[in-house]
Regions:
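Glycine-rich Rossmann-fold phosphate-binding loop(s) that bind the pyrophosphate
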Residues: 114-116
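Residues in the short beta-alpha loop(s) of Rossmann-like NAD(P)-binding domains
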Residues: 2-3, 139
Length: 175
């Protein structure tokens, strides 16, 4: 693990008020790992080819975690985390800095690009705070790859707060 802790994106996402239950996940992983006599966790360690070769593994599993994809959309990279265009990391940093209190969200238009788990988490934050939310995805269904429980709660949230959904839709440009 190249970071000083395990848990990956879940430790960051757990800063969202509706996701605080995830804060215990890294502790759970550590407790499980501690019971396994044949598992070693190296923190603050980059998984280089030379480092992996030192272990002489029979099997290698690439479990590199989740990093938000920044697709090659005109104007996107230039505007990320500058102003009103955020990755999930920028959005959570703004939440933690107090930039999105409930009164600031009322009536704001929020467009989420990507209907996967992270996009659904963003909607779950803004919709109950009175934002006018829209979610778009290139797939034919929002939350298409989500588990059944997430799909059920997503549908409930989207219906309750009037979240607009656009499927088979791709963002072309950010201005």
């Amino acid at each position: 693990e190249k970071n000083d802790h395990i848990g990956g994106l879940s430790t960051f996402i757990s800063d969202l008020p509706s996701k605080t239950r995830m804060k215990d996940f890294p502790k759970y992983l550590e407790a499980r790992a501690a019971r396994l006599k044949n598992l070693y966790i190296f923190l603050n360690t980059e998984a280089t080819v030379d480092k992996i070769k030192q272990f002489k593994p029979d099997i290698i599993v690439n479990s590199t975690g989740s990093v938000p994809l920044v697709p090659p959309i005109k104007g996107l990279k230039e505007n990320i985390d500058a102003g009103n265009v955020n990755t999930i990391f920028g959005m959570i940093n703004n939440v933690n800095a107090g930039k999105y209190p409930e009164e600031a969200c009322q009536g704001k238009k929020v467009v989420v690009v990507g209907g996967g788990s992270v996009g659904l988490d963003v909607i779950e934050y803004f919709a109950p705070r009175g934002a006018e939310c829209t979610i778009i995805d290139m797939l034919p269904q929002i939350g298409m790859l989500a588990d059944p429980i997430t799909k059920c709660s997503m549908r409930e949230t989207h219906d309750k707060y009037g979240v607009k959904e656009y499927v088979n839709t791709a963002l072309q440009e950010v201005k």
